[in-house]
């Protein structure tokens, strides 16, 4: 979705806004990726958020870093006061799309607004499942193995330790006696650096990227008319990104904090649709059917009929067969001749 913003910004001629979002996106997306790695490290390589929960108390530095990244990617901010990085760059793109005055620009504006809602929902879903709620760690096979190994050998699990004295008491709260630890400083320092960019990069650089033609020094086409139109869009356009962000946040909070039974109930009502999206539109299955299986079939045909049936048969295997057959005949004649010679000498 973030790359989509950059493309349709360039499509309406807002090249500065596209580059600005590329710039801010580098901070918060890298921050979220590295933050996810820190969480996976703490959870003994478990990557399924359904087996996380309540981690903010155990890995607080990672939590605050990922919170900064989430606030940036969802575009949290107060108009005219301060906002995180994505607040400035994403809003600039939506304003440019609306201000372009074209039908495609209007379509891009509404599609971008809907994408912002989805981004907000899945980003806050990630945060709520990972850092809030009750621990669901013991449901993870990775955590079960870590607990079993630590209990059996008495050593520390990767990124955590096992509390054997309270293991039985902990099973009821979903931890299984597993205690995640914060990542080492070598992983936390990059999170801190990227957090600064996720928080301040938009506020510091938005005028340079959007309003300052001298900043680009002719590197991109600068449309002053479009920039002027961006500043003149209605207030509701400027507030659209914030409103859809709040809607996405509210839906995620309702489903994953307020009433955690909502996702399961929803899946029961739309099971075919859920399976379609859960299986990634069955893209892997279609790709396997259309490309992989035919490629393997052709490969087997070339191997069986071409390589084995022709090349090997009339090549090395055929020559070998001829030599072996000739050798067997010669060997038989020599053996027969030696037998007659031996018999004659005996006589």
Each language-model region and where it sits:
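Predominantly late transmembrane helices and immediately cytosolic-facing juxtamembrane segments
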Residues: 29, 33, 106-178, 190, ...
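Cytosolic juxtamembrane amphipathic/interface segments immediately preceding
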Residues: 46-55, 168-183, 225-230, 325-336
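Alpha-helical transmembrane segments and their helix-start/interface "positive-inside/aromatic belt" motifs
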Residues: 57-67, 127, 181-196
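Divalent metal-coordination and catalytic microenvironments
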Residues: 25, 52, 86, 127, ...
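Hydrophobic alpha-helical membrane-insertion segments
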Residues: 66-78, 190-209, 280, 298-302
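Hydrophobic, small-residue-rich alpha-helical packing segments that form membrane-like cores
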Residues: 1-99
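Alpha-helical transmembrane segments of polytopic integral membrane proteins
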Residues: 33-36, 45, 81, 90-91, ...
């Amino acid at each position: 979705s973030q790359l989509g913003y950059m493309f349709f910004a360039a499509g309406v001629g807002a090249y500065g806004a596209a580059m600005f979002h590329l710039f801010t996106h580098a901070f918060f997306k890298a921050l979220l990726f590295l933050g996810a790695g820190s969480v996976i490290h703490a959870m003994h390589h478990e990557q399924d958020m359904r087996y996380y929960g309540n981690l903010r108390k155990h890995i607080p530095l990672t939590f605050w870093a990922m919170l900064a990244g989430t606030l940036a990617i969802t575009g949290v901010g107060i108009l005219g006061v301060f906002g995180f990085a994505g607040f400035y760059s994403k809003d600039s793109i939506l304003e440019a799309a609306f201000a372009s005055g074209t039908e495609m620009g209007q379509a891009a504006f509404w599609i971008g607004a809907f994408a912002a809602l989805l981004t907000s929902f899945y980003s806050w879903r990630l945060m709520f499942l990972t850092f809030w709620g009750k621990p669901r760690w013991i449901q993870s096979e990775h955590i079960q193995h870590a607990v079993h190994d630590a209990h059996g050998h008495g050593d520390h699990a990767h990124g955590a330790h096992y509390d054997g004295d309270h293991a039985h008491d902990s099973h009821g709260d979903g931890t299984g006696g597993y205690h995640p630890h914060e990542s080492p400083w070598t992983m936390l320092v990059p999170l801190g650096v990227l957090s600064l960019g996720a928080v301040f990069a938009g506020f510091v650089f938005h005028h340079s990227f959007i309003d300052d033609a001298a900043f680009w020094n002719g590197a991109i086409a600068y449309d002053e008319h479009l920039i002027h139109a961006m500043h003149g869009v209605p207030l509701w356009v400027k507030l659209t990104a914030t409103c859809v962000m709040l809607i996405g946040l509210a839906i995620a909070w309702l489903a994953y904090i307020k009433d955690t039974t909502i996702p399961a109930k929803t899946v029961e009502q739309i099971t075919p649709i859920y399976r379609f999206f859960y299986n990634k539109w069955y893209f892997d299955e279609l790709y396997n059917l259309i490309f992989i299986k035919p490629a393997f079939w052709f490969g087997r045909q070339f191997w069986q009929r071409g390589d084995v049936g022709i090349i090997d048969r009339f090549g090395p295997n055929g020559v070998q067969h001829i030599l072996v057959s000739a050798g067997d005949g010669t060997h038989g004649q020599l053996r027969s001749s030696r037998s007659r010679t031996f018999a004659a000498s005996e006589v």
